[in-house]
Amino acid sequence: MKIIFNADDFGISPGAVYGILESYKRGVVKSTTLLANSPAFDLAVEVAKENPGLDIGAHLTLTFGSPVLQGLETLTDDDGRFRRNYTALENGLADVDMNEVERELTAQIEKILDAGITISHFDTHHSIEPLIYPVQHKLAEKYGVSIRRHSDVSDFGAIKTPDLFATEFYADGVSFETIKKLVQEHIGTNDVVEVMTHPAYIDETLREISSYVEPRIKEVSILTSRELQAYLGQQEVEIISFRDL
């Protein structure tokens, strides 16, 4: 089997940037996805350019912070900010203009590209793929990138995806045993499994803007541990990135 350890939220805070960098340089993370509207976007771009082996994707969002574009009436609240989570977006989906969705997501992608970063894949913040999949699919075809797999779609056409998207390594599931169990379920197969991760060093920016905080430092510890890397080696698990699909 092959595993992609993808670190979400690249750029959400300086601590997240450095936590992901540590998980790449000393651990098993080879792919990460960058938030174009994040507070530490410029730092993330700088770190990405200094570490060209770190595979970068776009962490497309309609539920975090403010949009890259202005005047998106169906996607924002009275303060011009995105709705705060999946449920809020889903509840207002009937009123959302999908043309606005495409324009904004394109702007996020182009901002990353304009910063000199090559993008290999797309995923989304708060896993909103089921709500916007036709737009995401169209943009993936346009930019020639891979996407994160999700259970609502069975046929991804010519777009490359892993065979499985694993969300178990999150919150109370952040443990070596979680990854070990996943490996045991797929060992001896040709499956490519993406494991969602959120490693970060905790800082005030992260505390202010994210509800998922404390487990992130534990993720750094596990993803950089010799125990995990030795186990994956013993099981002959190949660690790859989205570039390798």
UniProtKB/Swiss-Prot annotation:
Cofactors demanded by this protein: Mg(2+)
The protein's enzyme class: hydrolase
Keywords recorded for this protein, A-Z: Carbohydrate metabolism, Hydrolase, Magnesium, Metal-binding
EC number(s) stated in the UniProt entry for this protein: 3.5.1.-
Any single biological process term in GO: polysaccharide catabolic process
SUPFAM superfamilies to which the protein is assigned, alphabetical: Glycoside hydrolase/deacetylase (SSF88713)
Binding site for Mg(2+): 59, 125
GO molecular function: deacetylase activity; hydrolase activity, acting on carbon-nitrogen (but not peptide) bonds, in linear amides; metal ion binding
Record text on subunit structure and interactions: Homodimer.
Family statement drawn from the similarity comment of this UniProt entry: Belongs to the YdjC deacetylase family.
Function summary: Probably catalyzes the deacetylation of acetylated carbohydrates an important step in the degradation of oligosaccharides.
Protein name: Carbohydrate deacetylase
